């Protein structure tokens, strides 16, 4: 039995909960990445954790392969979103509501869990700068020695109106906030260069792989697939928008 002890379950003060977009619209997965990760662990059963799991399909696809899959999501709107079937089946079993910027611990049969594989794409930038350190600290304590993390972080702004419509480039063709009298929601609260994220990740003890893809925005990326990226839903590095995200593969 898997349980979660969380200081706070719903990030009810987050713009992503108040103006839900990804929590209700996103249910991305990547069979290609799953196969690559499984191959890296010699196709043995692994424990995986997905942070900001939205509809939960990436987690469910690992479960369907016999793995221990856990997803954490900060908005309760996800329960009625595109991944409703997943949440109906796995809520409080494998999919949990959790504010990942507050202290939490996942347990299996009463013992603290550590994970072979931890994944988070298009999540870190949604976290307030003041909460990034706490988020990374929580991730690090849940990672096994010699475990693997895949982090994908958007580097571009994302502002929405009350209808969830894009208001600024690159997702909107022009800046629509000028003269707009309605309410605006800044979903990407932490828009920083890739090197800022690299330094922040390393400051919490994560070790970026020397192998893999290394360039201006990508650090040790070991795989030929991703789950998504920069809102374009690409499953293969190099798709349109690839350079609008930073990708990291790291271990303890």
Model-derived segments and spans:
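Conserved N-terminal segment of class I S-adenosyl-L-methionine
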Residues: 1-113, 117-121, 133-136, 212, ...
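S-adenosyl-L-methionine-dependent methyltransferase catalytic module, highlighting the catalytic core
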Residues: 27, 86, 101, 127-144, ...
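Short catalytic micro-motifs in class I SAM-dependent methyltransferases
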Residues: 122-126
């Amino acid at each position: 039995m898997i349980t979660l002890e969380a200081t706070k379950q719903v990030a009810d003060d987050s713009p992503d909960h108040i103006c839900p977009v990804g929590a209700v619209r996103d249910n991305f997965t990547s069979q290609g990445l799953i196969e690559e990760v499984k191959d890296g662990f010699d196709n043995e059963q692994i424990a995986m954790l997905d942070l900001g799991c939205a509809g939960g399909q990436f987690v469910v696809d690992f479960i369907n392969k016999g793995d221990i899959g856990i997803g954490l999501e900060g908005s309760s709107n996800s329960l009625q979103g595109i991944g409703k079937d997943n949440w109906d089946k796995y809520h409080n079993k494998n999919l949990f509501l959790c504010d990942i910027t507050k202290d939490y611990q996942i347990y299996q049969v009463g013992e603290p869990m550590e994970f072979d594989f931890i994944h988070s794409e298009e999540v870190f930038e949604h976290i307030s700068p003041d909460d990034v350190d706490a988020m990374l600290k929580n991730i690090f304590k849940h990672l096994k020695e010699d475990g693997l993390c895949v982090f994908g972080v958007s580097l571009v702004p994302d502002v929405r109106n009350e209808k969830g419509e894009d208001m600024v480039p690159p997702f909107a063709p022009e800046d629509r906030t000028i003269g707009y009298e309605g309410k605006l929601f800044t979903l990407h609260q932490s828009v920083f260069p890739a090197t800022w994220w690299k330094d922040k990740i390393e400051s919490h003890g994560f070790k970026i792989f020397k192998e893999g893809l290394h360039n201006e925005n990508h650090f040790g990326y070991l795989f030929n697939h991703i789950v998504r990226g920069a809102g374009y839903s690409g499953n293969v590095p190099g798709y349109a928008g690839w350079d609008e995200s930073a990708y990291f593969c790291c271990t303890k």
